[in-house]
Each structure stands twice: as structure tokens, then as C-alpha cells.
């Protein structure tokens, strides 16, 4: 068994980004990305899950001027689900907190995926 540590804690993982539908530069990060409490994905659904992302996009006051479609203003940003996805066959490339890179398969046990997505949880896997 392996317990929590930097080599067993997920720091980041791949996400397939949507094309910029306005055809130009995406703009400053505050206008193009959505962050959920400092994270871009959560560990609830395994990699490449068929579950839909549930992300409400936060928009700056200039959204209409910059041609940013689909913006909604939301009060609660803490109940979002943003799944790690890739075009690799069978899984996603992920970086662990020790700097190592691992290929995590789509078949990872959901409990194990959730465990590596947290730090200091005391999980053993």
C-alpha cells in the first residue's frame, strides 16, 4: 500500500480546451478561464468520463465588448464539475506534486482517482 505524499497527489491533469469561437486571441486569463476554488478540475469523475462538465463561466463586465459568448454570472462557484479529458487513447497525462508525470488510465477506480486528487487525506491505495 502507498499512503499520501507528493508522489501520490495530483497537481494537474489534461483538459481539452474549447476552440475560441470569436476567432482571435482568447484575452486575459480572467476572461477565458473558470477556476473552481483555485483548481481547474476536480476528482469526482474519472478521466475522460462521459459525464458532462458542469461549469458556469464567470464573465467580466466587458464580456459583450470582447465577444465572449455563453457567459453567465453566478453566485456559487463551488459546486462545479470539470472533468480531466484528453485525446490520448485510454487515459490522461497528469502531473503529480513531486513533478513526475503519469499516464492515468480511464479505468482507474473512482475511489483511487478521488484519493490522488486530494492531499493529506490519509488515504492508502
Label every model-predicted segment.
Residues 1-125:
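Hydrophobic alpha-helical interface faces used for helix-helix packing
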